[in-house]
Amino acid sequence: MSEEKQTPEQEAEVEAQEEAVQADTEEVTQDEQSAFQEKIDELQQLLDEKENKILRVQADFENYKRRARTEVETVQKYRSQHVVSDLLPALDNFERALGIDPDNEQAKSLLEGMQMVYRQLVEALKNEGVEPIEAVGKEFDPNLHQAVMQVEDENFDSNIVVEELQKGYKLKDRVIRPSMVKVNQ
C-alpha cells in the first residue's frame, strides 16, 4: 500500500474547507434555532388563545347552568298560576253567593254546604301559596291595587283604599290579580 502524503498546502486547503463547512453549519444552526423559536412562540400564543377560549366556554356553560336552574325553580314555584287564575272567578262567585241571606231552611242548608266547599277551596289555594291582598284601610299601592274610583271620605286619609270592589290575590310573591279598589283623594 502506498500512502499519500499531503503537502502543507493541501492540509491548509482541507482545513479551510472544514472551517467553511463548520461556519455554514453554525449559521444554519442559528437560523434553525431562530425559526424554531419563532414557531415555539407562535404555538405558545395559539395555546394561550385556546386556553382563554376554553375558560370563556366553561364560564358561559356555568352561567347557562345557573340560568337554567333558576328558570326551572321559577317554573316550579309558579306552576299553578294558570289554574289559580282560572279558579279566581269561581271563588268570587262563591263569595257573592255566600253573601245572600237565606229565607228558608232549605236555602240555609244549601248555604252551609256552599260554605264548606268554599272553605275547602280557599284552603287548597292557601296550600298552593295563594293569599288575598289586604286592601281596605291600606295605602294605595299600584303594584297591588287597581284604582277604579276615587272618592272623598273624611274617615280616611288621602291615598288610602276606602273600599274593595274585587279581591286581589298573590301567588307566593307574585300578584296574579290586583285588587280593584276605591281610593280616597
UniProtKB/Swiss-Prot annotation:
Keywords for the protein's UniProt record, in alphabetical order: Chaperone, Cytoplasm, Stress response
Gene source species: Bacillus pumilus (strain SAFR-032)
Keyword Magnesium attributed: no
Role according to the record: Participates actively in the response to hyperosmotic and heat shock by preventing the aggregation of stress-denatured proteins, in association with DnaK and GrpE. It is the nucleotide exchange factor for DnaK and may function as a thermosensor. Unfolded proteins bind initially to DnaJ; upon interaction with the DnaJ-bound protein, DnaK hydrolyzes its bound ATP, resulting in the formation of a stable complex. GrpE releases ADP from DnaK; ATP binding to DnaK triggers the release of the substrate protein, thus completing the reaction cycle.
Subcellular location: Cytoplasm
Entry similarity comment: Belongs to the GrpE family.
Protein name (record): Protein GrpE
HAMAP family documented for this protein: GrpE (MF_01151)
Highest taxon, organism lineage: Bacteria
Location of region: Disordered: 1-37
Main location (coarse class): cytoplasm
Oligomer status and interactors: Homodimer.
Any one Pfam family match given in the protein's UniProt record, by short name: GrpE
